[in-house]
Amino acid sequence: SVGYAYANRNLPDRRLIERTDRMEQRMGIYRISREFTRLDEHIVSAGSNYRKDFRFGTFEPTLKAGAYGEYRTRTYRTRQFQYGWQPDNTLPQGFLFADDVQEDVLTDANYGPDKLYLYEEVNFLNNYGGDQTQLAGYLGINLPLGAFNIYAGARYEYNRHVLKMNTRQFEESLQSTAYGNNDIFPSVNLTYKLNDKQQLRAAYGRSVNRPEFRELSTSVYYDFELGSSVMGNYDLKPAYIDNFDLRYEWYPSAGEQISVAFFYKHFKNPIEWTYTVAGGTDLIYSFMNARGANNYGI
């Protein structure tokens, strides 16, 4: 199979109005900004799967194999503009306390040398690009052994990120940083049939959570759910998860299932939130690797 996908995100004019407490307990305008953002991503992929059934008397194992390749490119560009005004401006009195900023403040009559003016907050550090190459192959075998059924296999993955970031704020100064990993992810699934309606399952598998482009880049973007700015961390490492699962399953009738499961997950280098304080009070969230974590339950 062969696939192609394209995704984009275009924010042509996002306006952010920030207010703060001023005299007489009224909320006054603190800052007005406009942001123009464009993200484009292209993904090309190809994959192939193979299956071979064998028969050795009553023993009927199955061999499975496959390969997968993916190439992804991304570009992200953003520009931010701020409205400014001088302390001795000739704007209408009390404009900072206007309820409808768009209608009462951002009007043609309020633009001028001694009124409102618009300037760009140049920051090339917020732009980035990159590409990702992933090559994978897997091999697995299914072994029916009477009441037991064993499926075991492994997946090999080669993954390479190339992130292109600017090193200077006021000019285009792209620098490429490469991140590469070669990993093997084993898995095994053991099923034991107690009878026609009940069975036990035990499984183990290893997986990975790789950092995304925006989690690695130095780009700063505003997250409305957090109510704060977010910045990436180019020192992030992939997080690896070892998954264990033990399950009892009962099928009392067709279409019905009752199961009880215990799971345990061990995380190495999990990616977590962190934050720093900028400008005395503003929070900037980012990402970091914790040393490890465990998660288990029933």
Identify the meaning behind each predicted range.
Residues 10-15, 51, 191, 247, ...:
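Intrinsic disorder/low-complexity detector
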Residues 2-32, 162-179, 216-231, 274-286:
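Solvent-exposed loop segments that connect transmembrane elements
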Residues 233, 237, 257-298:
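Outer membrane beta-barrel strand-and-loop segments of large Gram-negative receptors
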Residues 2-10, 82, 104, 267-270:
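Short, solvent-exposed beta-strand-terminating loops
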